Regions:
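Eukaryotic intrinsically disordered, low-complexity regulatory linkers and tails enriched in Ser/Thr/Pro
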Residues: 1-13, 17-62
Length: 62
């Protein structure tokens, strides 16, 4: 799970395994394999870095 910030400043945890795509339009829109979408304050690169960090934690066993 990664934490992101919605446009209303609410923080939410999302399942990074369900992310299908991330695009900037100019807001960052995360699309999920479930068909849902969420608009967040983080940039596309920030989301990428969060997912990479999360995956490293899981696979290293921290």
């Amino acid at each position: 799970m990664i934490e992101v910030t919605k446009l209303n400043d609410k923080k939410v945890l999302i399942n990074s395994d369900l992310i299908e795509s991330v695009e900037e339009t100019p807001d960052t829109v995360i699309s999920f394999t479930t068909g849902k979408k969420i608009i967040v304050k983080e940039s596309r690169q920030d989301i990428k870095n969060l997912v990479i960090s999360y995956k490293k934690e899981i696979f290293v066993g921290i």
